[in-house]
Amino acid sequence: MCVLFSLLLLASVFSLGQTTWGVSSPKNVQGLSGSCLLIPCIFSYPADVPVSNGITAIWYYDYSGKRQVVIHSGDPKLVDKRFRGRAELMGNMDHKVCNLLLKDLKPEDSGTYNFRFEISDSNRWLDVKGTTVTVTTDPSPPTITIPEELREGMERNFNCSTPYLCLQEKQVSLQWRGQDPTHSVTSSFQSLEPTGVYHQTTLHMALSWQDHGRTLLCQFSLGAHSSRKEVYLQVPHAPKGVEILLSSSGRNILPGDPVTLTCRVNSSYPAVSAVQWARDGVNLGVTGHVLRLFSAAWNDSGAYTCQATNDMGSLVSSPLSLHVFMAEVKMNPAGPVLENETVTLLCSTPKEAPQELRYSWYKNHILLEDAHASTLHLPAVTRADTGFYFCEVQNAQGSERSSPLSVVVRYPPLTPDLTTFLETQAGLVGILHCSVVSEPLATVVLSHGGLTLASNSGENDFNPRFRISSAPNSLRLEIRDLQPADSGEYTCLAVNSLGNSTSSLDFYANVARLLINPSAEVVEGQAVTLSCRSGLSPAPDTRFSWYLNGALLLEGSSSSLLLPAASSTDAGSYYCRTQAGPNTSGPSLPTVLTVFYPPRKPTFTARLDLDTSGVGDGRRGILLCHVDSDPPAQLRLLHKGHVVATSLPSRCGSCSQRTKVSRTSNSLHVEIQKPVLEDEGVYLCEASNTLGNSSAAASFNAKATVLVITPSNTLREGTEANLTCNVNQEVAVSPANFSWFRNGVLWTQGSLETVRLQPVARTDAAVYACRLLTEDGAQLSAPVVLSVLYAPDPPKLSALLDVGQGHMAVFICTVDSYPLAHLSLFRGDHLLATNLEPQRPSHGRIQAKATANSLQLEVRELGLVDSGNYHCEATNILGSANSSLFFQVRGAWVQVSPSPELREGQAVVLSCQVPTGVSEGTSYSWYQDGRPLQESTSSTLRIAAISLRQAGAYHCQAQAPDTAIASLAAPVSLHVSYTPRHVTLSALLSTDPERLGHLVCSVQSDPPAQLQLFHRNRLVASTLQGADELAGSNPRLHVTVLPNELRLQIHFPELEDDGTYTCEASNTLGQASAAADFDAQAVRVTVWPNATVQEGQQVNLTCLVWSTHQDSLSYTWYKGGQQLLGARSITLPSVKVLDATSYRCGVGLPGHAPHLSRPVTLDVLHAPRNLRLTYLLETQGRQLALVLCTVDSRPPAQLTLSHGDQLVASSTEASVPNTLRLELQDPRPSNEGLYSCSAHSPLGKANTSLELLLEGVRVKMNPSGSVPEGEPVTVTCEDPAALSSALYAWFHNGHWLQEGPASSLQFLVTTRAHAGAYFCQVHDTQGTRSSRPASLQILYAPRDAVLSSFRDSRTRLMVVIQCTVDSEPPAEMVLSHNGKVLAASHERHSSASGIGHIQVARNALRLQVQDVTLGDGNTYVCTAQNTLGSISTTQRLLTETDIRVTAEPGLDVPEGTALNLSCLLPGGSGPTGNSSFTWFWNRHRLHSAPVPTLSFTPVVRAQAGLYHCRADLPTGATTSAPVMLRVLYPPKTPTLIVFVEPQGGHQGILDCRVDSEPLAILTLHRGSQLVASNQLHDAPTKPHIRVTAPPNALRVDIEELGPSNQGEYVCTASNTLGSASASAYFGTRALHQLQLFQRLLWVLGFLAGFLCLLLGLVAYHTWRKKSSTKLNEDENSAEMATKKNTIQEEVVAAL
């Protein structure tokens, strides 16, 4: 059958002589599971084959095997079920297209597919080859083809293709990523041809240097399937992005600072081969990426560039301006100048100086105001312009000063200053001194009577009585043994090259001289001695006369007048006269003795004068303050904290025109015209001078407030009254608020000036006053009495019964009325008494007493007739009233036994008596203070032991059974006495200027106790003595005695009043006591001029003590708790901010504890400084930016913050002082820019600025910044302000990565190369913004483990075993040997079980093992493990093959010790006969010997160093490792060098150095006080002392050299082997000696110069003389020669 089929097929093929039957399809087609694929297919058949019924298309799967039908166009039922619905014939059979589409591919669809088409039974064809289909689950990576040559500027195509293609899939893509979209174009091509099926994307790029290092990624995606492939571009290019980085960016570069310039290249391929540096276009000849200036100088300023070169080319960076921040002063013209010339000083700065420099000029360290330009012009200079000038340049980063330049102005001598003195201390001596001011120095000549006596040029009168000394521009003549001829006129002449001047003075030889010791100006209490000296010869009867203020004070034989304690009365003009026999000296010149004393308590009065002339207001206030002091005190008058007037003349623009101030010495008179309310109050007069201060206060009442009652002060009840408060004030208070007082008590407050009483009631009658409420308070008006008239009210009539001494009744009638009422008392119709005639009754049983509106009637020996109706009538001009009562006489009374006066605890019996006797059945009731006593119903009340609470009024009531009326007894009072109890003693001190102490002792006692007050066992006050008697004992004490109370007032308490007071209370029954401590506050600190001062002012702090023992006081000061030297006062010549602290002084009396004052805080005001402007950004949500400006200022500065030219914030009263805070909510790019902060205060201002960068761009990593290797990571650039057209540039570890519209980087498979720092830049129309770098950490398991070992053979065999590994995170490492753990990284402090020392580092473990036994079994295992995996490695220690050096006794030996170094062979074997050993010291060859030992007997310090040996053995030469030999020795004598600042001696340096091994401990002592040490914890710290301690050296810099820092300093050096010390004097004494030595050198130089000039003149004169003689000899010789020649010529002619 097959043979027949083949024959028929051949016949059909060759029937027409051509091959037209065939099928074309790809050999291979690939697809992905779940996707689809298309097998392109075309077929052909001969043209002459008829097609009548169409063509049947059949696709088979595995035709040679299973032969499953995939497609059957004739009978679809024949299709295998697994292909039904998934296979589709896509071709048109009429067009001979037979494409097969397979959908929903599965892996089992892989295999061979064959196409068969049938036209008829005899015309059919089968594609035997078929198409192989491969279906996989994951796609294979795309195929990338790249050009061979890549270079910058070329355009190249990069092709990426994949065999997977399915047109029916919509989610299929083949894309290039990582390219720059602005310089590249992509195109795509799909091939569905019988020749092949593939999908290709072409990337066309214009290459640039930025493409170097770019990773191109081609990614294929089909539904959920994807694959990718990367290619790394290497584009050769010249260096790009060359720039210079400055190490000192952001601050000033000062002279001497190290500066590093780094040439950074952004990109270069190949690598940079050369870097050249240039400054200002001139090649510096320096190569390398880094240019280091170890010490910046003037010439280092300039514009720097660097040029980077590789094989592709070179690039020069942009110039970087380097400015060395320094200044130099240049002068035009240079050198000394003459007066009236113009001088210009230029403050020159190096090149590349910034434009915003600010200049300041200083002369002699004093700032010149209004000199802020780079040049300083001095037109028409004078001698006052001579001095040292320097300039200061300043910018935002700091300031720097130039070196000083000396400006010398030359001028002729001024008028000389000629003075004369008489010295009679050791013989009569006259001194004449002449000094002059000139430039250059002048020649000074002193003459008398036309005769030159002395000159500073050396032309002197060599008189043995004369002693001459001179200095520059100064001449001093001392004349001994004065004679009358020495009197007369003396003349001083001064001459220099520019002119001369003279002055004259009369000198008298025989004149007395008055000397005052210690000075003509002393402080009160100081001892003063006045001495009288004259030229008279001493005689036995020499007399001295003393005169004070022209009047004879004393006459006697003593030449001295002693004032043991000078007082103000001793001040005056003194002179003396001497008389010796018949000779009398002239009077001495008057000398004024001035005695200084602090201000006494001022006399201060304040009064109001009323002008009775009737012209004008007629009111004026007079304030007069007078004080006694010398020097005159500065007076200040203060009112409500404000200065009203001072004794210093000043213009007060804010003072009232009504105030007139008159000033005299120590007196201040202030007159206030028409005083108003604001002028009232307490005025304080302060007086202060350099020795102390005092004050006094006075109250001034201007009567500016007047109360007026209308219509009258006396009104009838029910009428209307208006009370008006009239206030005379300068500025009306709006709204006004008034306080009204009634009978001295606050009545009402409000804004009404008038209070209306409508209607007026009797209760309104009172004393009224008012005042205006102000902040400082105001005086009350004068009180006004309001009287209210009304008729009498019904009188109050009462009757009292007293039977204590017999029956007595008292009738009292009182009434309320005004005016006073006429009172009459009646019994029935019988008039008993009136207040007009109170003694009207004539009998003595009835007595009447009358007071205002009160009438009292006493009726004694009451009888039944006194019972009846009593009534009282009251009458005045406005009306009358009456009242009545019925009085019945009752017969009971109370009898007390033993007495109503009782002692506490005593028994008492009270009996109820009735006059008619006791009836049977009478009942009794007892009452205490009106309260019934239930426990007693008998006629007797017994109290066994009476107490205080049982004292009071007792009465009884007797009720007879046969009567209805009870008999009520009058009350009887029981008084109970008791011992003193509850003694209290309180001690108070008022703080007003009067200083008043109060001691109050009170007690509960009956009878009143006798009180005694003791102080230190001394009776101070007592109730036994009268107040006058006690006050007379001490005028400062005032005693007030009240019942059971004793008050002691101490006026101006003194130090001796301090202490414990005891109060003792006693009466006849007992005693008690109490104690209290009294603080007199007699020690007080006063601050002059004020406790609030400006920085730089002089401040005096004085310890004021109120004490009667001023001479025996000792003082101690405390500054901020630190004790200072003791003195009554301390002076701060120039107060600093550091001085702003609390001060207190302590005063001690002999034998008593010191008394401390209350602290006083010194407030130092200064201009704003340390202005700082910073900003903070919220890192999470970026919703807030905080701009913070702070400054150091006192008083607090007014801060303003500006953005550009717009003010954005300023400080207010509610702000934190010296702080300004600006919060920017949701900041935008418009908020970025330059912010300026200014600080203003009354003392100055400061400014600073800052560039605000919001940093709104940030890099975010997903899923996190730390991922395991191989995991995908997406790096996103987030910028909330980015526009849609923004471009994103990415940088990795500072290198450009890519740029494009994509805001994210995707790493599908991360590797270690992806780790590092990423940051991005966003470019849009708003500008360019950069993010901060974000770190990406790639985690991976440990790898590349290395276990190594090496030996350290110094003195013993030591092996170091080290294991390292590469891992992230760091691995935990374990080192083991034979299964035993020797070391572990997580036990870094272990000692390896005593085996050796362990060192742990990141991914490294190091073990030092001593005395390792070499040989087998030395296998070590290192294991490293982290969370991602572990790794281990092994290492066997090698056997020892090298020689080593051993030392005996060791390598650290003391100097002088014997030492042997041995060259030890491997294994400890000895040397053979042909061996030799060579020793080396510090790499220098010493010697060779056959023995391996190098001996030192003994070793010295110079032999310390590195030693190693070389052994020449028969087997070859080998060299040991070097060992270090240390020779130990004690310190040598230290070198102590002292440096003192030559200008003013304010700074100094002590430098101590020593040689020792081991290093020495250095200490520096002044006396017994430790000043510094190189052991930091030993030395005390002081702010003005800076200590530096390099090895074996100690340096101490003292910035403020004071007396406490001067003295002998000792530097001591010690180590374990010994110690040594050296000393030197440190202070200004050395500076003074240096200055004296400099002056001596100047004089010697002058003398040497003069001598050289003189020798030169002599030599010149000798030379001239010799030259003249030689010339004459030469002329004579010439003449003789001429004559000789003439003779010879004549002889020749004759011949």
Swiss-Prot record:
Effect of W21Q: Loss of sialic acid binding
Effect of inactivating the gene: SIGLEC1-deficient mice are viable, display no gross developmental abnormalities, and exhibit only subtle changes in B- and T-cell populations. However, they are significantly more susceptible to bacterial infection than WT. In addition, serum IgM and IgG amounts are greatly reduced in mutant mice.
Gene3D superfamilies assigned: Immunoglobulins (2.60.40.10)
Cytoplasmic side: 1661-1695
Disulfide bonds listed in the record: C36-C166, C41-C98, C160-C218, C263-C306, C347-C391, C434-C492, C532-C576, C625-C685, C725-C770, C813-C872, C912-C956, C1001-C1063, C1103-C1145, C1189-C1237, C1277-C1320, C1363-C1422, C1463-C1509, C1552-C1611
Short name of any one Pfam family annotated for the protein: V-set
Expression by tissue: Detected in lymph node in the subcapsular sinus, interfollicular regions, and T and B-cell boundary (at protein level). Expressed by macrophages in various tissues. Highest expression in spleen and lymph node with lower amounts in lung, liver, bone marrow, heart and skin. No expression in thymus, kidney, brain or small intestine.
UniProt keyword list: Cell adhesion, Cell membrane, Disulfide bond, Endocytosis, Glycoprotein, Immunoglobulin domain, Lectin, Membrane, Repeat, Secreted, Signal, Transmembrane, Transmembrane helix
Motif window: Cell attachment site: 827-829
Function per UniProt: Macrophage-restricted adhesion molecule that mediates sialic-acid dependent binding to lymphocytes, including granulocytes, monocytes, natural killer cells, B-cells and CD8 T-cells. Plays a crucial role in limiting bacterial dissemination by engaging sialylated bacteria to promote effective phagocytosis and antigen presentation for the adaptive immune response. Mediates the uptake of various enveloped viruses via sialic acid recognition and subsequently induces the formation of intracellular compartments filled with virions (VCCs).
Entry similarity comment: Belongs to the immunoglobulin superfamily. SIGLEC (sialic acid binding Ig-like lectin) family.
Protein name, UniProt field: Sialoadhesin
UniProt source species: Mus musculus (Mouse)
Origin organism lineage: Eukaryota, Metazoa, Chordata, Craniata, Vertebrata
